[in-house]
């Protein structure tokens, strides 16, 4: 029997990480992060790896399908807990090296390059990477030979008929696997609701070049930093249109550096202009590639919109091309930045105003259907998506005649069994899955996050109670984030009065801790009455 335990990526978008276990051996497929958008000082969120201990297996390795952060970003945190080798395609490992170096764990890491068609063994598993197309270079699916037969994990994919790097989706290999028999297919569910062709990266290049050629000033392209295919096309466009590429933003600089080092970005040496020289060039000679397509406040696009970027300032006649999908939930921030740019006389182009400036890297429903047709699996488990995406993808598999289909979420085991030529998937035990929030490289306790959230919603009150020689307490009370209006002094005075009343009623033998608690309750009670708020309240008693 094969057991599959998703630690992340099922029931959500991002943080992809899945364990496969048989005979006491386990491998992880991908190890990614997600982000917390609540504004609580969280850098990244990664899977809780403790369920691996409860799985009762020895983790032999991590197999990386491609280099997106939601597939590799948690590796530094995993390696601090499990000393395991990491297998992955060259470009992904280039990004992994950069990430591990930042966390000072590269020296002890074992990174092993994979290649499509090159089979290798990890414990009781045999693994074959297969070329797929995606919005990042060097993306692969994996075929895993297990005790129950062949398991195919697609990773992130789409069917791009004209990939910019010439690395085509290997439909023939998937078809051959289908001929030989696939027990289980686990397939990318992200765009299951989208009908129609997914679109090719090469088509994006044509649309953007038309906009660059007609622009009277500088052109700024905001995109996901990891889309090396698009970055490659922009370099070719810049050369033909006699412009220089300027990279603004740490992410795009890192990806360009790794891509050039690994041969995936064949730019001529003179195509890139250092950002500190951008102000010296004629605007029509510049093609800037910037981070911040999702409205991130500290990213390059937001800084350009605020006119506080040290290297460049936008001006009337410039053109911004939003060459990225806006992730649901980010719309207010993205629209606010676009508005700031427009107030500066900048033309803003989006996929809504100009078709073709962006295509998705994830398979639309027809591509998902094609993957099932090629592999003809006996069993199916949808991966990578919310419960809505997973359920819709499962429905598609059933429509196409897949005999055994299971929908699971993070922490719920799927058991795969096979008897002669019959195979089935069943939901097994719930081992559990959690999330670890990280700030400054260190985990943040859930209690700390809860307190931060409470402070953000309700504010903070600070109270110092000083007992002098006469025994009558002096009460000093200040607040932050509770009030700032004409009623403020009156409400503050009322809260101080409540504290004094509470202290006056304290029993004679009450400790300072007892008095502090009486004061805390009085403050919260007073502000609940006057402000409908219960601020986090800190009380100190001094004598």
Question: What name fits each language-model region?
Answer:
Residues 1-63, 68-280, 299-313, 332-335:
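His/Asp/Glu-rich metal-coordinating catalytic cores
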Residues 17, 124, 139-141, 285, ...:
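Broad gene-expression machinery/nucleic-acid interaction feature
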Residues 113-114, 289, 538-542:
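Extended hydrophobic secondary-structure segments that form protein cores and membrane-embedded regions
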Residues 193-329, 333-353, 357, 363-511, ...:
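Hard-cation-handling environments
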Residues 100, 397, 527:
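Conserved hydrophobic residues forming the short capping helix/wall of the S-adenosyl-L-methionine
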Residues 10, 34-38, 45, 58-59, ...:
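A glycine- and charged-residue-rich anion-binding loop/surface
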Residues 512-543:
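C-terminal tails and terminal domains of large nucleic-acid-associated
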Residues 85, 381, 537-541:
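Short glycine-rich phosphate-binding loop at a beta-alpha junction
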């Amino acid at each position: 029997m094969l057991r599959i335990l998703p630690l992340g990526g099922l029931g959500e978008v991002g943080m992809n990480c899945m364990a496969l276990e048989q005979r006491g051996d386990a491998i992880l497929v991908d190890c990614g992060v997600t982000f917390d958008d609540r504004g609580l000082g969280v850098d990244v969120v990664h899977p809780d790896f403790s369920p691996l201990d409860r799985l009762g297996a020895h983790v032999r390795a991590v197999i990386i399908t491609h280099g997106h952060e939601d597939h590799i970003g948690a590796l530094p945190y995993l390696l601090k807990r499990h000393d395991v080798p990491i297998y992955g395609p060259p470009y992904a490992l280039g990004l992994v090296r950069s990430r591990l170096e930042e966390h000072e764990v590269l020296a002890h890491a074992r990174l092993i390059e994979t290649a499509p068609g090159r089979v290798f063994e990890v414990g009781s598993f045999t693994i074959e990477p297969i070329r797929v197309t995606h919005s990042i270079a060097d993306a692969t699916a994996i075929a895993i030979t297990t005790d129950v037969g062949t398991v195919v994990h697609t990773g992130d994919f789409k069917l791009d008929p004209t990939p910019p790097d010439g690395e085509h989706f290997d439909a023939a290999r998937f078809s051959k696997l289908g001929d030989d028999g696939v027990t289980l297919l686990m397939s990318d569910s992200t765009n299951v609701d989208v009908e129609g062709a997914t679109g090719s990266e090469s088509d994006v290049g044509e649309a953007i070049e038309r906009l660059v050629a007609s622009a009277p000033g500088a052109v700024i392209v905001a995109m996901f930093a990891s889309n090396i295919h698009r970055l490659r096309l922009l370099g070719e466009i810049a050369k033909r249109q006699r412009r220089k590429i300027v990279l603004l933003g740490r992410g795009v600089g890192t990806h360009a550096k790794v891509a050039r080092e690994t041969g995936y970005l064949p730019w001529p040496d003179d195509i890139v202009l250092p950002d500190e020289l951008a102000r010296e060039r004629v605007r029509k000679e510049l093609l800037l590639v910037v981070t911040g397509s999702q409205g991130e406040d500290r990213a390059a696009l937001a800084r350009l919109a605020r006119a506080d970027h040290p290297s460049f300032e936008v001006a009337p006649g410039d053109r911004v091309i939003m060459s990225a999908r806006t992730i649901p939930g980010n719309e207010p921030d993205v629209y606010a930045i676009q508005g700031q740019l427009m107030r500066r006389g900048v033309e803003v182009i989006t996929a809504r105003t100009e078709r073709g400036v962006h295509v998705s890297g994830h398979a639309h429903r027809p591509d998902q259907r094609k993957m099932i047709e090629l592999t003809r699996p006996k069993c199916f488990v949808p991966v990578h998506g919310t419960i809505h995406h997973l359920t819709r993808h499962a429905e598609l598999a059933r429509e196409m005649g897949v005999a055994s289909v299971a929908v699971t979420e993070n922490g719920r085991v799927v058991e795969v069994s096979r008897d002669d030529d019959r195979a089935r998937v069943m939901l097994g035990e719930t081992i559990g899955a959690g999330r670890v929030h990280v700030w400054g490289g260190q985990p943040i306790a859930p209690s700390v996050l809860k307190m931060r959230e409470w402070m953000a919603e309700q504010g903070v009150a600070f109270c110092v109670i000083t007992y002098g020689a006469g025994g009558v307490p002096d009460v000093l009370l200040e607040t932050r984030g509770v009030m700032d209006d004409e009623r403020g002094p009156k409400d503050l005075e009322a809260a101080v009065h409540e504290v004094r009343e509470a202290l006056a009623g304290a029993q004679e033998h009450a400790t300072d801790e007892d008095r502090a608690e009486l004061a805390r309750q009085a403050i919260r009670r007073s502000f609940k009455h006057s402000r409908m708020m219960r601020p986090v309240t800190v009380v100190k008693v001094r004598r």
